[in-house]
Amino acid sequence: MTQHDVFVATEYPAPVVRAVIEVALGTAFQPSHGPEPVPALTIGPTKVFFHDSHPFEDDADFAVSRYRYWVNVEDSARDQQRQLAIAQRVFDAVKAEGWPAMLSFGLQGNLAVYP
């Protein structure tokens, strides 16, 4: 399944960034259960995962090293329109805070970048 991702650059601590996303999506992150537990929230069949960091490096079409946080959005029903709509809400929320952000699809370049 291909996912949408939002990368965020800010010096604010993770709880502040998560709180902005929670307000935008109207629900709270909960600890996820897995080998690498990361905070996650659920909106219907769509899950939003918040990572304090990411393992990605820059390439020609994907300059990601400037971003500190990684928000991964995946829809278990494979509804890419719903998945994109939720990722866009996350992107818009962090953009409204004035934080640099990038919205991508499948980690293959960007759909939107701010600023």
Model-derived segments and spans:
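Short, extreme N-terminal segment that most often corresponds to the first beta-strand
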Residues: 1-30
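Ordered hydrophobic segments in well-structured contexts
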Residues: 5-7, 47, 68-72, 100-104
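A short linear-motif detector with a strong N-terminal bias
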Residues: 8, 28, 47-52, 80-83, ...
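Short, flexible beta-strand-to-coil junctions
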Residues: 11-12, 72-79, 106-108
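Hydrophobic/basic alpha-helical segments enriched in Actinobacteria
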Residues: 21-23, 46, 89
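Short, intrinsically disordered low-complexity segments
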Residues: 28-77, 114
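Acidic, proline/glycine-rich low-complexity IDRs
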Residues: 81-115
